[in-house]
């Protein structure tokens, strides 16, 4: 015990995903493709929105920031995870662990409130169409983007500071593939109940607050859509929200499973599997959800490809 108290942890080791070499190959190739698709999809969405003037409206302003957050959150985790797959000692420094958690937490919380901002935007567009340009001014849109980043920063600073000022003087093997809060706290040489309660309370408050904004917005949207007489009008109105609802359901369901349910319900190993979904898969899915189910994005893609094709054809002729 004396040796445990005198040892200060300067680095952590990850257990990783699997020790089977054949599975490692499969996982590496799978998540390399997922990561490349994430970067291609999200950066492509940002470039498309920037280049196509018809997409210079609030809805796509928020979507470009969502794509930026997805690309960043995936880049915080995936490169390190991929480089560790074939390595026996999956090591990260104490400071590196704190930075990884800090950045990832920032982007996850920001994404939750960006989705809330997008829900409010859809509410105004469908329920108050005549006042849309007045309400969703450039100033309001900027505020609805700065707000999520600010809330994410505050939440992250609280959790990172409270977790990494604890003494770590014993085991330094994290049962995970990245520095998530609960696996790190399990290694602390102090009582972590306060930290776990803080995580549960803040995750609950932030989740409920952003969730209420989304829920109330969609209740009003649903009421308005049901008042539309034509079936075609109802279908068009709902189609503008379906992509957003899909993204919200996937993200909130996964985060609730990890952070809000009682910690004793499932093991850290199950958390690890679920974490793969929201660290790697969700950032990849969002741009495809919004592009495949959105006519304006598909039309913008077609216009971009046609423009590029025409330019290349002109160059060949000239």
Curated annotation (Swiss-Prot):
Function noted in UniProt: Potential odorant receptor.
GO terms for biological process, alphabetical: G protein-coupled receptor signaling pathway; sensory perception of smell
Cytoplasmic domain ranges by topology: 47-54, 121-133, 218-237, 293-318
GO molecular function ontology, one term from the record: olfactory receptor activity
Residues listed as glycosylation sites in the UniProt record: 5
Cysteines paired by S-S bonds: 97-189
UniProt record similarity statement: Belongs to the G-protein coupled receptor 1 family.
PROSITE patterns linked to this entry: G_PROTEIN_RECEP_F1_1, G_PROTEIN_RECEP_F1_2
Membrane topology category: Multi-pass membrane protein
Keyword Transmembrane helix attributed: yes
Compartment annotation: Cell membrane
Protein name listed in UniProt: Olfactory receptor 5G25
Entry-linked InterPro entries: GPCR_Rhodpsn (IPR000276), GPCR_Rhodpsn_7TM (IPR017452), Olfact_rcpt (IPR000725)
Keyword vocabulary terms for this entry: Cell membrane, Disulfide bond, G-protein coupled receptor, Glycoprotein, Membrane, Olfaction, Receptor, Sensory transduction, Transducer, Transmembrane, Transmembrane helix
Extracellular side: 1-25, 76-99, 155-196, 259-271
One term under GO cellular component: membrane
